[in-house]
Curated annotation (Swiss-Prot):
Family: Belongs to the pyrroline-5-carboxylate reductase family.
A GO term for molecular function: pyrroline-5-carboxylate reductase activity
Record-listed E.C. numbers: 1.5.1.2
Origin species: Arabidopsis thaliana
Alphabetical list of Pfam families matching this protein: F420_oxidored, P5CR_dimer
Protein's name in the database: Pyrroline-5-carboxylate reductase
Amino acid sequence: MEILPIPAESFKVGFIGAGKMAESIARGVVASGVLPPNRICTAVHSNLNRRDVFESFGVNVFSTSEEVVKESDVVIFSVKPQVVKKAVTELKSKLSKNKILVSVAAGIKLNDLQEWSGQDRFIRVMPNTPAAVGEAASVMSLGTGATEEDGAIVAMLFGAVGKILKADEKMFDAVTGLSGSGPAYIFLAIEALADGGVAAGLPRELALSLASQTVLGAATMVSKTGKHPGVLKDDVTSPGGTTIAGVHELEKGSFRATLMNAVVAAAKRSRELSQS
């Protein structure tokens, strides 16, 4: 059967699962003007609070997932990994080649998604929690039946909550170790920087504000200047100055090696979980 292109000017998006990630994506899509809220839907079975949340910014909320699939051209499975198989198989008879299917469930491979759904027009996306503030680092991989045009539509949707890049699915465990788990590493770093500020005599509130803004500013410099972070580091480390003294302490504590080890360990754990 011929795959029909999704109408770019009128397509509708439906979320299976009405949790925080679905909310973040939906809010981003609406706020950025990618889609009006009346072209987005989800289903809430019993949690009235989640219904109120989605309805508060104009999203259509149905009572069943079957209604979501029926009304949508792009169906995004935004449920926990342990229940995604059940969610997909229960809707199998409603899915077709005329719909783009998307999963954001960590560790669930395209082969499994395609087998459970009976469809190969699937796209796997790995977002991360900063999607909640429009600063996600997402990676996507296309299934065997998904077209480049399908990928462009999904990139447009997830681009509304941050940056989205394309990669081979075999890289997803490493992606999990870096961008998936990475926010936690940075939260820890911000907390440690703030604690250092307190130890040096700063009030807690001031220390935390300076720490978080410093990390944000440094990340923005890397992103916007295109300079290698090592070059930016060299630019701020004067001979015999304060910054190189601090960098020296980080090097003595194996700061870089510890971060590298954290990424590798998380990637290894992701690989183990996906094989279990």
